[in-house]
């Protein structure tokens, strides 16, 4: 009798995706982040669902409803902090996942890569709208500043901003629609993730060497299910430590002050995972230029496959490109630090230099390094 998992229409899909999936035998721990992102997404949807049961999307009660969740709801505090810090873990895994793709040349699977970029934008939009919901000072002013950037679009900018706001300022209408979008977008992310996997399984996974591995593949289960469980346990450990010992470590103290349109916080800044893009935005004095740089800082990933000049796929055997990659990582950490600093003398210049370097590495230096490496190897 044939095994039900190989014949049943639904079980067959699960079997081909997670059990009998042929997987390269040499993929490292850097390939764990896909499954970790899936775990993060499930965690965020579940904790978000329970938070939505108690949250009210009205400007007069939003802040106090979050306080009520933390103080009066059974284990409400842990659900709230799992959700808030779960978002941080989500972005750590996302950036590691994208970094792995850049390092090992996974971007040559263009469909998978492009859907990944759409996923990144969608998750960023979801996180931004979620940050507005507690209706603290940073929620309100963050929403005001970021949505206001759209007014830089010629002709339609101002109308577009007022259309998003649902009025002439960030108010009740804005909060209600942000809550609605924040609720629905994770399900859009889930659907996109399924398409992302669909395209990935058309080609099969890449591996650290970047060489075709069809001749040497092993079933996903039990080898990689065990490996993924280890990664998941480590993720849960870090998240648990964060939630139970320092839940506000990555948050902003200003968000414990109820939103007040009449009082501007001294330093308006988004959550830590957007600081690199915020630093790029701030480093350009022109408003439209800043907005374009902000969008391009992520959209540049879509151009990376077109700029691949190396004869090798990954960077495993390319020392010059490796150096540039780690320069890029250091540059992004510098931008993250700058994004959290006030707009004054040394920080402005450092931010501008780091922003120029970011685009230079991806657009100019990496393609040149690849050509040099090809010539060194006489390819």
From Swiss-Prot:
Pfam families: Cytochrom_B_C, Cytochrome_B
Entry coiled-coil feature ranges: none
Recorded GO CC terms: mitochondrial inner membrane; respiratory chain complex III
Subcellular location(s) of the protein: Mitochondrion inner membrane
Amino acids binding heme b b562: 83, 182
Chief localization: mitochondrion
Cofactor mode of binding and number, as noted: Binds 2 heme b groups non-covalently.
Binding site for a ubiquinone: 201
GO biological process: mitochondrial electron transport, ubiquinol to cytochrome c
Positions bound to heme b b566: 97, 196
Membrane-spanning ranges: 33-53, 77-98, 113-133, 178-198, 226-246, 288-308, 320-340, 347-367
Keywords, in A-Z order: Electron transport, Heme, Iron, Membrane, Metal-binding, Mitochondrion, Mitochondrion inner membrane, Respiratory chain, Transmembrane, Transmembrane helix, Transport, Ubiquinone
GO molecular function annotations of the record: metal ion binding; ubiquinol-cytochrome-c reductase activity
CC cofactor: heme b
Membrane topology: Multi-pass membrane protein
Miscellaneous section: Heme 1 (or BL or b562) is low-potential and absorbs at about 562 nm, and heme 2 (or BH or b566) is high-potential and absorbs at about 566 nm.
Subunit structure: The cytochrome bc1 complex contains 11 subunits: 3 respiratory subunits (MT-CYB, CYC1 and UQCRFS1), 2 core proteins (UQCRC1 and UQCRC2) and 6 low-molecular weight proteins (UQCRH/QCR6, UQCRB/QCR7, UQCRQ/QCR8, UQCR10/QCR9, UQCR11/QCR10 and a cleavage product of UQCRFS1). This cytochrome bc1 complex then forms a dimer.
Family designation: Belongs to the cytochrome b family.
Role: Component of the ubiquinol-cytochrome c reductase complex (complex III or cytochrome b-c1 complex) that is part of the mitochondrial respiratory chain. The b-c1 complex mediates electron transfer from ubiquinol to cytochrome c. Contributes to the generation of a proton gradient across the mitochondrial membrane that is then used for ATP synthesis.
Protein name per UniProt: Cytochrome b
Organism from which the protein derives: Phoca vitulina
Lineage of source species: Eukaryota, Metazoa, Chordata, Craniata, Vertebrata
Gene of this entry: MT-CYB
